[in-house]
Every structure is written in C-alpha cells, then in structure tokens.
Amino acid sequence: MKFWKYHGIGNDFIVLDCITDPVPVDPAWCEQVCDRHFGIGADGVLYILPGQGTDITMRIINADSSEAEMCGNGIRCVAKHAVDTGLVDKDEFTIMTGRGVLKAKVRKDPDDEYTSFVQIDMGAPILDARSVPVDFDGRFIDQPFEADGVKFHANAVSMGNPHFLSLIHI
C-alpha cells in the first residue's frame, strides 16, 4: 500500500489514493496507523475516492477511529495531492465530503510543477448549537462558560466538525 504524509497548518495526515490503488475504508486500521508510538502517527487518514457527481470524494477517519464530516486542513491536503499527482487535471474542481460538495481552487508555483496555493469554499458556518452539537437551544454565541474555575465567553460553531471557540485578549 502506497501512502503519503501531509501537514496542514498544525495537523498531519496519512493520505491514501484509493482511485489508483483501491483500499477499503477501515477505521480500526486508521486508529493503529495514526498511533504516534506504534504507527506512522497522524491526526487522521484522508481517503481520496472516486467522485460522486464530483471530481473526487474525501473521507476522513480520525486517529480515534471516528469519521469526521470535514476538516479544513485535511481537504486542502487532499486538493493539493489530487492536483500534484494528476488525479485532477484542472485548477478548479469539486470534492464530495461528509458535509456535502465543496469547491477547491489551486494555483501552481510558476517555478516548479507543484501546487503552492489551495483555496476551499467551506460554505457558511453552522451556528445552531444542536447541529454543532451542543446541548443548548439556539446559537451558542458569546455565551458565558466556566472550566477549571476560569470564566470566559465562548462560541460553538461547525464547518463539518465541531469547534468551541473563545477569544482571548493577551
């Protein structure tokens, strides 16, 4: 099995081209290879699969074997890999994700053959707390929150995977 290791703004992934070399999506295997002590080590495995009415499909299996709908850092790695390896032969294309169809735009470095810029239209953020999911009615925006005796305000948002955000003034 051939794989690639990609890094995207602090996340690292094992990338599998399942178009050229089909392998089954196997969450238990992903958990093993993502282990940083006994495996390759990664935040997750990115499967690049044939498109479903799109140019390609991406599935993400996290290091704990759960499946994510989307990951911004992961989809940029997938888009770069797809163009750099010839799976996709255009600068703008579509990727099916667990969150739906997302549009990718890439730009190659004029001095070499590799992609130097990747832009993904992530769509609108999900702000409804129950859809994030958070046990709260409505939008969880600038809500008071306490953890370990520290009080702060936080926001719950999803772009296909849940985020809990707090702005901190330093």
PLM region spans:
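A glycine-rich beta-to-alpha transition motif near the start of alpha/beta enzyme domains, typified by
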Residues: 1-114, 165-167
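ATP-dependent small-molecule kinase catalytic core of the GHMP/sugar-kinase superfamily
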Residues: 97-167
